[in-house]
Amino acid sequence: MGEALSNLEIARGAKLLPIEEVGRSMGLREERHLEPYGRHVAKVDLCAIEDLSERPKAKYILVSAITPTPLGEGKTTTTVGLGQAFSHIGKRATIAIRQASMGPAFGIKGGAAGGGYSQVVPMERLNLHLTGDLHAVTEAHNMLAAMIDNHLYHGNGLGIEPHSISWRRVMDVNDRSLRNIVIGLGARTDGVPRQSGFDITAASEVMAILALASSLEDLRERLGRIVIGHNREGNPVSAEDVRGAGAMAVILKEAIKPNLMQTLEGTPALVHAGPFGNIATGNSSVVADLIGIRTADYLITEAGFGADMGAERFFNIKCRISGLEPDAAVVVATVRALKAHSGRYQIKAGAPLPEELLEENPQDVLAGAENLKKQIENIKLHGVPAVVAINAFPTDHPSEHKAIEEAAKEVGARCAVCRHFTEGGKGAVELARALEETIEENERERRRGGGGSFRFLYPLEMPLKQKIETIAREVYGAEGVEYDAEALRALEGFERAGFGRLPVCLAKTHLSLSSDPALKGAPRGWKLSVREVRASVGAGFIYPICGQMRTMPGLSAHPAAERIDLDGEGNVVGLF
């Protein structure tokens, strides 16, 4: 047996369809809807939302997961594999995924195109620049930062308190040395000195706005609502106030159009927006879903991290804006992650898996499956049926898969073993059939007056504090919530400012249901600690901060960037 091909080698060996042909398979017209960026990528004009509105709606499927290990459990690969699998059973699918950030691609996480024989291609394009959307977000964000400092320099007519300015600068590189900086040093003509810093572009509120805007007009309005700080009277100061929103909208005019690509098997893939999964929604764009929902029998999208994170935000933030209701959700699980949730193993990013983790041990899988059960419950809290996808690895044992199936059955979820990484769509046919049956069964039950109907976890009228406590108790399993004095003051201020009807997006670790990354499984008897509360008014949510949140990552001792290069023919090498 030869050495296994890398993701890049597999992707490079694919025979790709012209992007116009991919568009035609979705009902998109080349001359009206597609703006090609080379042979295999195109922007999709937003007029497609209206043009396709009379077509039947696809079944809407969310791909989520158990609480992941630092290695990730294969949500994107499963999303791609599932999209491909539907064609094997005579159905059409479109997938919608987030756009990759280059910071993690050159760091330790790896790419965002899937893996093995379930990838979106060309994968180098997806992971490196694509059509330049992240650069546009970076430019728009920094344009506003420049306008703020320019306003201070030219007399500060709005009376902005410099220490209150929360709008930092961004770049799409992991660079810890820029987390905290002082700007405006030098001569008086070099600006007003103040402390600031850089975040990674994916953490920008502009990226969250790009993901949640439902039209170009909505994008412009949301940009204007961004709060950058407050004045001497304590009133919020917006991007509109400093007259920066118009220029930002112009910079983002093309970036709001979703990118069309394809999988290795020719399934259409809408790739758009990439907001952080910790402090923002962690979902691809609303406009991509509004287009995709009219282009196939099934639209499959994914949400970042576990169901307590990305899925909760998908249901309570993204779906409120799009008006779309999911028909089913997938919870991706792996044997290695469930063993880790037993609390008996430690998995570290960049380090080899512990040898004992690979030994047959269904008891440890069952011990860790409490996390799986809780994440299935988190899906069902919203009236959505769940199907478990066991993302199989060669080191798994049949008894361990059986243990996962038993745990899923206990909470009323179907289960499917998936081998889409090695087999492509064929390896996820069992999952596609399980979803088809689950959706049909739920619809039959609904017609009889039973079955699940999609519902939000809380009404927008609920006070912010109560929304936080509802998510903490119902989704995370917390006993209660403890607030720092600063967090309580911020909540009161947001209610007074008229932001109380916004949904909440709790910023916490993705490595645990709790706010402590060391607590595995489904911990009980703990309290969520909220140390600070911030507002993304433009994006349209309040985000309480629980624990330490890094918005600018650093590079590891040996980042992926060390291995990435060009060969003698100008081809990228070392990229996954």
Curated annotation (Swiss-Prot):
Entry-linked NCBIfam families: PRK13505.1 (NF010030)
Gene that specifies this protein: fhs1
Protein family according to the UniProt entry: Belongs to the formate--tetrahydrofolate ligase family.
Organism: Rubrobacter xylanophilus (strain DSM 9941 / JCM 11954 / NBRC 16129 / PRD-1)
Binding site for ATP: T69, P70, L71, G72, E73, G74, K75, T76
SUPFAM superfamilies, per the entry: P-loop containing nucleoside triphosphate hydrolases
Pathway listed: One-carbon metabolism; tetrahydrofolate interconversion
UniProt GO MF annotations: ATP binding; formate-tetrahydrofolate ligase activity
Top-rank lineage group of the source organism: Bacteria
Protein name per UniProt: Formate--tetrahydrofolate ligase 1
Keywords: ATP-binding, Ligase, Nucleotide-binding, One-carbon metabolism
Keyword flag Thylakoid: no
EC numbers: 6.3.4.3
Reaction(s) the record says it catalyses: (6S)-5,6,7,8-tetrahydrofolate + formate + ATP = (6R)-10-formyltetrahydrofolate + ADP + phosphate
InterPro entries per record: Formate_THF_ligase, Formate_THF_ligase_CS, P-loop_NTPase
